[in-house]
């Protein structure tokens, strides 16, 4: 399960950014996952719950947004979404398409409670 190593790196980044901002704790993390990123949301959530214990991210809510896959035909340049004929260009029927969106996986935002806020 590669989600474990992905989540470990994700947590390192989140904790580092939160500490840099002098946060008291992390309350929400907004993640973006491309349709073809190969990342399973439930696995990331499970790994995050376990790995974030005893960190300032413990109890933070993970929110996921999806980016649909998009392709560009290398033969005619037409761009198109994924569909029934996965990599077949609907314009020229060519089979030589490249993925131009949908492989992404990144942190969109981190919501924190800072030290200046009262309990």
Swiss-Prot record:
Cross-referenced Gene3D superfamilies, in alphabetical order?
3.30.2320.80
InterPro entries linked to this entry: Hydgase_Ni_incorp_HypA/HybF_CS, HypA/HybF
By its UniProt entry, which Pfam families does this protein fall under?
HypA
Instruction: Kindly give the PROSITE patterns that the UniProt entry links to this protein.
Output: HYPA
Does Lipid metabolism appear among the keywords? Answer: no
The record, for NCBIfam families, names: hypA
Its protein name is Hydrogenase maturation factor HypA
**Gene, per the UniProt record:** hypA
